[in-house]
Structure formats: structure tokens, C-alpha cells
Swiss-Prot record:
It comes from Beauveria bassiana (strain ARSEF 2860). In plants, chitin acts as a microbe-associated molecular pattern (MAMP) that is recognized by lysin motif (LysM)-containing plant cell surface-localized pattern recognition receptors (PRRs) that activate a plethora of downstream immune responses. Disruption phenotype: Does not affect virulence to host insects. This is Secreted LysM effector Blys4. Might have a role in sequestration of chitin oligosaccharides (breakdown products of fungal cell walls that are released during invasion and act as triggers of host immunity) to dampen host defense.
């Protein structure tokens, strides 16, 4: 890449009809002359940028006292702080939805306690499963067969007995 760009020339950077006529090394200010003969100065330390008119008396209707190039401060409407924080709001909504989904998942995973209120038919009684119980041990302790337990509890899986759940047994 060359050291000089084609946009470093005055004719590319300055408004039409403007020429650079001087430079004050003490203040670092460039002076320019317009096609109508008026003089303009740039900002201190800036080669190009906002130009202000100098060296003449202002007439009542003359609005040349305004900067030649508009500044960026007046370029657009003032942006609200709410508009500036909009990406943060989007992030907050994403976090909120994630927490809501987590709460829903934990609520569903916990589920209702299926064995706490077992309704057993007449002639049977509920039995709460304790740690270490097996279908065989329950059948032996209540003098019934394993087939009788499975008949009264069709959804029972003897390999997966849940501690605290209830099953129905004959009296």
C-alpha cells in the first residue's frame, strides 16, 4: 500500500472552490481561501475538517458565520438511553426465557407424587415401599404370591420399585 493516498490532495478533501493559502506553525491552524475571496480557518492541529470564516465583518443577513462544514454533533436527533440499551434488553429477554424454561423443566421433572394417594379396591390395603423391598420380600411378608401383587398392580415393575410409592395388597 502506498504511503500517500489519492485522497490526500486538497482538491479531493476540500469543498469546491477552496484552496489552501497558509499555515501558522505556532497554532497549527491552516488557512483557506474560498472562490469569492473570503478566508476560512480549520481547527487547530487539523489539516481538514470543520472550517470557520475569519477576517471580515458580519452583515445582518450573512449566515456565513456558521461553520462551512456541519459538525457531527448536530447531524442527527438525540438518541434515547433506552435505545442505546436495546441490545441489553434483548439479552435480558433471552436470559428470562431460559430461566422460564428451566423452571418448567424442573416442575415437569419433579412431577406429581404418583404413589402418595393410592386408591385400593375393597378387600385390599395400601402398602408403602421401603428401602430394600423387593416384590418377593413383600409377597413373603404378607403371605401372598408375586402374581397376586402384579394382578392388583398392573403398572408395577418389580425391577424398578420406587421408595415411598404405594401398592395395593390383599388383607
Amino acid at each position: 500500500m502506498p504511503r500517500r493516498s489519492r485522497y490526500d490532495d486538497d482538491e479531493e478533501r476540500l469543498p469546491e472552490g477552496m484552496t489552501r493559502v497558509g499555515y501558522d506553525a505556532d497554532t497549527g491552524v491552516y488557512t483557506f481561501q474560498d472562490s469569492d475571496g473570503s478566508y476560512w480557518e480549520g481547527a487547530s492541529g487539523s489539516r481538514y475538517g470543520q472550517l470557520t470564516r475569519v477576517g471580515h465583518e458580519l452583515a445582518g443577513e450573512d449566515d456565513d458565520a456558521q461553520p462551512f462544514l456541519p459538525s457531527n454533533a448536530h447531524a442527527g436527533p438525540k438518541v434515547s438511553w433506552r435505545h442505546e440499551l436495546m441490545p441489553l434488553l434483548n439479552f435480558g429477554v433471552i436470559i428470562g426465557v431460559a430461566l422460564l424454561l428451566l423452571w418448567w423443566y424442573l416442575h415437569v421433572a419433579a412431577g406429581p407424587d404418583k404413589g402418595s394417594a393410592q386408591d385400593c379396591p375393597s378387600g385390599t390395603k395400601p402398602y408403602t415401599i421401603h428401602q430394600g423391598d423387593t416384590c418377593w420380600d413383600i409377597a413373603e411378608s404378607h403371605s401372598v404370591g408375586v402374581d397376586d401383587i402384579l394382578t392388583l398392580n398392573p403398572e408395577l415393575d418389580c425391577d424398578k420399585l420406587s421408595i415411598g410409592s404405594q401398592i395395593c395388597l390383599k388383607d
